[in-house]
Amino acid sequence: MLSPRRVKFRKQQRGRMRGIATRGNTIAFGTFALQAQECGWITSRQIEASRRAMTRYTKRGGKIWIRIFPDKPVTMRAAETRMGSGKGNPEFWVAVIKPGRILFEIGGPEITEELAKEAMRLAQYKLPVKTKFLVKEEQEAAVEATAQTAAVES
């Protein structure tokens, strides 16, 4: 499972998830992608389960890119421990997800849209956030259309 090799600080505060993703929100490597529609934490186990589901369905054809990395430690206290005496130990790692973030990409000559859609659907079931299937050409056309409307307005 994914986790950082070494970190500057072992423990982190939980933080807040506000706003939308400004980075990692366009398809960069593959032809098809899975985009988050809401915010949340995705654990390294969930990422691995999604990756395995997609790989198994595509029969190892094409290539899968994981666009998120679990770099936030989540700490937990031992069961039946009294209050106080410091923060618990890191138990697992999560990736903080904002709406619009690309989670997975898939591509290759043997990957059709139907195959990619079904593989992404199987991965979707393993994730705790709502997601949306994207096609690179459609996303590029949408970005171009918004750029043209912005140019006309100004």
UniProtKB/Swiss-Prot annotation:
Family in the record: Belongs to the universal ribosomal protein uL16 family.
Stored HAMAP family: Ribosomal_uL16
Entry keyword annotation includes Repressor: no
Subunit structure: Part of the 50S ribosomal subunit.
NCBIfam families per record: rplP_bact (TIGR01164)
Species whose genome carries this gene: Synechococcus sp. (strain RCC307)
This protein's GO CC annotations: cytosolic large ribosomal subunit
UniProt KW keywords: Ribonucleoprotein, Ribosomal protein, RNA-binding, rRNA-binding, tRNA-binding
Protein name per the record: Large ribosomal subunit protein uL16
GO biological process, one term: translation
GO molecular function, one term: structural constituent of ribosome
Free-text function comment from the UniProt entry: Binds 23S rRNA and is also seen to make contacts with the A and possibly P site tRNAs.
Pfam families referenced in this protein's UniProt entry, alphabetically: Ribosomal_L16
UniProt lineage: Bacteria, Bacillati, Cyanobacteriota, Cyanophyceae, Synechococcales
